[in-house]
Amino acid sequence: HGTPLVITAHSLEPFRPWKREQLGGGYNLSSWAEKDAYEHADRVIAVSAGMREDILTAYPNLDPDKVVVVHNGITMSQFETPADDDPGWKVFERYDIDQNKPTLLFVGRITRQKGLPYLLQALHFVDPGIQIVLCAGAPDTPEIMEEVKTAFAKLDEERGNIIWIEEMLPKPELNALEHGCDAFICPSIYEPLGIVNLEAMACGLPVVASATGGIPEVVVDGETGYLVPVDQLHDGTGTPTNPDKFVHDMADAINRIMDDPEK
């Protein structure tokens, strides 16, 4: 009807084939709807340069001039250090998190793209004196939840010093948690930008993150954290071509950053 169509791209179905586990036949429908919408859009906004490349790879019929990059941002005032009497700090007591231990934090949904199973493998090679806090919930499927539970139980038995928070924390508690930890980990295998890294850095945390998607546009290797190199299959899954190397490189980066988080 002559009304311009503008799309902001935060993810792409062709690069998330694991969504079929969650959506079943609905994945075919969402893939068709996305392709049709993109190819008829007057403008497509990508949240990173990496995302722009993915869009043009997934939908080669798109006019590249119609695809522009506008990075996501955050509201810095939402990530200020809580006052000493802020009730958000109670999250440490409720989950028995020792604020005197060096602590690594993960925040994310339990989904293939967030790379949690790789992190749980990597933590076997991380200094056991480092306390690990996993804020991980909202699993895509029962199958991946069981996979994570099994890996967590094995890790907990082997090294301990790990806390798993399954509930989605209210913002004041999550903000306090991020301000009270020492470093942040983002092991994603698909991440168009990675707002969690912006939020962690806004709280003063150095970040260890996979060098995939838009993450290298957010985390400056050697300055605001460490990037973990990862070669990936080009079959849409993003699976690391050498999972063992990815896992060990991640563990090495975690140990380095936790050895000197102020660096």
Segments (PLM) and residue ranges:
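Nucleotide-activated donor-binding/catalytic signature segment of Leloir-type glycosyltransferases, i.e.
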Residues: 101, 134-136, 145-168, 172
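Aromatic "clamp/platform" in nucleotide-sugar-dependent glycosyltransferases that forms part
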Residues: 189
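Carbohydrate-associated surface elements
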Residues: 50, 73
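Short alpha-helical donor nucleotide-sugar binding micro-motif in glycosyltransferases
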Residues: 175-181
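A conserved mid-protein helix/loop that constitutes part of the nucleotide-sugar donor-binding site
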Residues: 102, 106, 111-125
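Nucleotide-sugar donor phosphate/pyrophosphate-binding loop at the beta->alpha transition
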Residues: 3-4, 15-36, 53-56
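A short helix/loop element that forms part of the nucleotide-sugar donor recognition site in Leloir-type
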Residues: 80-96
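Short hydrophobic beta-strand element within catalytic cores of glycosyltransferases
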Residues: 206-209, 219, 226-227
